[in-house]
């Protein structure tokens, strides 16, 4: 009986040790960046728009928050700190709409995020009012 109890306890201890030593990779935190409003059009608005990155599923949500006639842009830097890694996703659907961009990123990829407002002019960066973007990047990992 003692021998059976010893085997069971030893096995349980080994299993507990093995489980405590395993690590699972996890995504970073959800981040949100806000764009300044166009105060000439919406003097009382707190923000012109926002961009949110959700690492779980790699979703970029771009929401227009002001009835100002401008689009909201989610500016996302994927994997590095240079302009070569920047991507611009536009929500041109108007106030109170959200564009959901489902990205496919490797786990652990560095992400930087800003939000801006602008007026689409045919190119990803054309028409962006860069003065409405936050000065600092919000950062996380995918």
List PLM regions with ranges.
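Secretory targeting and sorting signals
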Residues: 1-27
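Post-signal peptide N-terminal regions of Sec-secreted extracellular proteins
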Residues: 26-142
């Amino acid at each position: 009986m003692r021998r059976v109890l010893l085997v069971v306890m030893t096995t349980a201890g080994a299993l507990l040790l093995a489980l405590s030593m395993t690590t699972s990779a996890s995504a970073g935190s959800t981040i949100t960046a806000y764009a300044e409003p166009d105060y000439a059009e919406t003097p009382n608005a707190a923000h012109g728009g926002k961009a949110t990155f959700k690492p779980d599923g790699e979703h970029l949500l771009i929401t227009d928050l002001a009835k100002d006639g401008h689009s909201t842009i989610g500016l996302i830097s994927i994997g590095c700190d240079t302009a070569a890694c920047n991507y611009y996703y536009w929500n041109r659907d108007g106030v109170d709409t959200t564009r959901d961009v489902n990205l496919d990123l490797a786990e652990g990829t560095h992400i930087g995020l800003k939000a801006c407002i602008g007026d689409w002019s045919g190119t990803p960066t054309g028409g962006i009012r860069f003065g409405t973007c936050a000065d600092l990047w919000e950062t996380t990992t995918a």
